[in-house]
Curated annotation (Swiss-Prot):
Residues 496-505 have a biased composition (Basic and acidic residues). Component of the FACT complex, a general chromatin factor that acts to reorganize nucleosomes. The FACT complex is involved in multiple processes that require DNA as a template such as mRNA elongation, DNA replication and DNA repair. During transcription elongation the FACT complex acts as a histone chaperone that both destabilizes and restores nucleosomal structure. The keyword Nucleus applies. This is FACT complex subunit pob3. It comes from Aspergillus fumigatus (strain ATCC MYA-4609 / CBS 101355 / FGSC A1100 / Af293) (Neosartorya fumigata). Belongs to the SSRP1 family. Keywords: Chromosome, DNA damage, DNA repair, DNA replication, Nucleus, Transcription, Transcription regulation. One of its GO terms (biological process) is DNA-templated DNA replication. The gene is pob3. Its main location: nucleus. CDD domains: PH1_SSRP1-like, PH2_SSRP1-like, PH_TFIIH.
């Protein structure tokens, strides 16, 4: 037999580019045709091998002992004899010839193997999902389990060859379209035994094994969490923060901090997020002087069904202090996290969360710029994007609007900022809008209903950061004044003309009509003028509320629907 067997036009792990696969007594290797990193697998690491039909011909699936599942696609049917002979002689492994279920049924039996979840129909695999491709799983209903797949960040999609070992767990990134979620409907009950999960429908004639009967969907969910290592071992949890309010996505979550990831545990959804996915870390004080916001920029973004959340926004109380001791050995703390983490914390919760996130993720904490202070001495300016109210923060190198929709703009990408008035004369005198136009036709962002008092602080910040801006409000003011003057001239001329035409009416003596009731005029107005109430002082009161909201804002829950009437602010205890 030859010392090596080579195969051309082979695709590794759904890679875009083919490569050359070579088998030898020491192991196997794959190198992309266009050049790049070579993938190798030692012969001692090969546990089993399977041969089956696949997308580009025939596929050789290798179940390794420590590297999960390796897929080699693109073989011809004639290659099976050479492959099976090489595996038998060099690795002592029989290549199993497997046939897939082609009936198209969407019901079958799930089997948890060592490296993947298999969905079998009539004892044949319909599809398999490697555990390394599963990023998260949730109980979507009483009998329904949602499985989410790993996504590739926009910036790293082409960072490595698709067959690279550094891309392990991101096979779907090779294609322009990728499956992001799959749901399993699992009715009934089941019992977990040493041999696996035994459902109530299994009829194998064996004696019933001891085990606690529970909901089949719950047992499937817990088993998948364990196999896919979504929920890490409790002993590996460095720190836990309970019942933390999140504005985006909305809800309260427990935060478990691990070595390379953190987990959000809510009543309905659980999320596992790698620290490597954190691209930006913001610490932003709210205007109510009672809360602070911690904002994490994520890439790839967090997913909840069809909704994507590129920013994670949590809200913490400034006066809430906690005492926390890290669940970490002194050796690990000294060797890996020296000068990054402390063994014990006893200070406000927002500082503890920030310090631990910074120590474990290694990300720099970004805070509001010292070059901007609002008219009322705050770091954020109250405004809105369409119907969503929030706070706009001015940082040294960027702008960010939170909580919903969280919007991030880098200053270096800003072409010009336009300050303008929108609306009638009353609203124009109290608020204004700013439109941020981006360079190279990247679009624009409009922030509305900014208090008129913030104009000067904003202009000073734009000048300090050398941001080009236009103030269109001065032109609007001149136009309003000119219109008012013209209107006064017309009214005075009308009065003169009117008195000249009255004739003998000027000689009439004015007297009080004793039968006249003052309320009758308003009654007539209400009957014939549908806008009688809205045209009076009510609009002025509403505008006063709008302009004063930034002053009196205390415990405002900004993630609620803005269409609802504003509630009275709460006073912290």
């Amino acid at each position: 037999m030859r010392t090596a067997e080579a195969f051309d036009n082979i695709y590794l792990d759904l890679s875009k580019q083919p490569g050359k696969c070579k088998l030898a007594e020491s192991g196997l290797g794959w190198r992309p045709s266009g050049g790049g990193e070579t993938f190798t697998l030692d012969s001692n690491n090969i546990g089993a091998a399977q041969w089956s039909r696949a997308a580009k011909g025939y596929e050789l699936k290798i179940l390794s002992r420590s590297s999960g599942v390796i897929q080699l696609d693109g073989f011809d049917q004639e290659d099976f004899e050479r492959l099976s002979k090489a595996f038998k002689i060099w690795y002592g492994i029989n290549v199993e010839n497997r046939e897939h279920a082609l009936r198209g049924w969407n019901w079958g039996k799930a089997e948890f193997t060592k490296a993947e979840l298999a969905f079998n129909v009539q004892n044949r695999p319909a599809f398999e999902i490697p555990y390394s491709e599963i990023s998260n799983t949730n109980l979507a209903g009483k009998n329904e389990v949602a499985v989410e797949f790993a996504l590739t960040s926009d910036g790293d999609a082409n960072a490595q060859p698709s067959g690279s070992t550094k891309n392990r767990g991101r096979k779907a990134a090779a294609g322009p379209d990728e499956l992001v979620e799959m749901r399993f409907y699992i009715p009934g009950t089941a019992v977990k035994t040493e041999k696996g999960i035994k459902t109530e429908n299994d009829e194998n004639g064996e004696e019933e094994e001891e085990g606690e009967e529970q909901n089949a969907a719950n047992l499937f969910y817990e088993t998948l969490m364990e196999k896919a290592e979504i929920g890490d071992v409790a002993g590996d949890t460095f720190a836990t923060f309970l019942d933390v309010l999140h504005l985006t996505p909305r809800g309260r979550f427990d935060i478990d901090m691990y070595e390379s990831s953190f987990r959000l545990r809510g009543k309905t959804y659980d999320y596992k997020i790698q620290y490597a996915s954190i691209k930006k870390f913001f610490l932003l004080p709210k205007n109510d002087e009672m809360h602070t916001l911690i904002v994490l920029g994520l890439d790839p973004p967090l997913r909840q069904g069809q909704t994507r959340y590129p920013f994670l926004v949590m809200q913490l109380k400034l006066d809430e202090e906690i005492s926390l001791e890290l669940n970490m050995t002194e050796e690990l703390l000294e060797s890996r996290y020296k000068d990054k983490l402390e063994p014990r914390y006893e200070e406000p919760i927002h500082q503890v969360v920030t310090k631990i996130f910074r120590g474990l993720s290694g990300k720099k904490v970004i805070m509001p710029s010292k070059d901007f202070v609002s008219h009322h001495g705050h770091s954020g300016v109250k405004c809105s994007i369409k119907a969503n109210e929030g706070l706009l923060y001015f940082l040294d190198k960027s702008l960010i609007f939170v909580p919903k929709p969280a919007t991030y703009v880098q200053i270096e990408n800003i072409a010009v900022i336009t300050m303008s008035r929108v609306g009638g004369a009353v609203s124009a005198s109290r608020t204004f809008d700013i439109t941020v136009t981006l360079k190279a036709g990247m679009g624009e962002h409009q922030f509305s209903n900014i208090n008129r008092e913030e104009q000067q602080p904003l202009e000073e910040f734009f000048k300090a950061k050398n941001i080009r801006f236009k103030n269109e409000m001065s032109d609007d003011t001149s136009a309003l004044i000119a219109a008012a003057l013209d209107n006064d001239d017309m009214m005075s001329s009308d009065e003169d003309g009117g008195r000249a035409d009255r004739g003998s009416a000027d000689e009439d003596e004015e007297s009080v009509d004793e039968d006249f009731q003052a309320e009758s005029e308003s009654d007539v107005a209400e009957e014939f003028d549908s806008e009688h109430e809205s045209s009076g002082s009510a609009s002025d009161a509403e505008m006063d509320d709008a302009s004063d909201a930034g002053d009196d804002e205390e415990d405002v829950d900004m993630s609620e629907e803005e269409e609802r009437p504003k509630k009275k602010s709460k006073i912290g205890k």
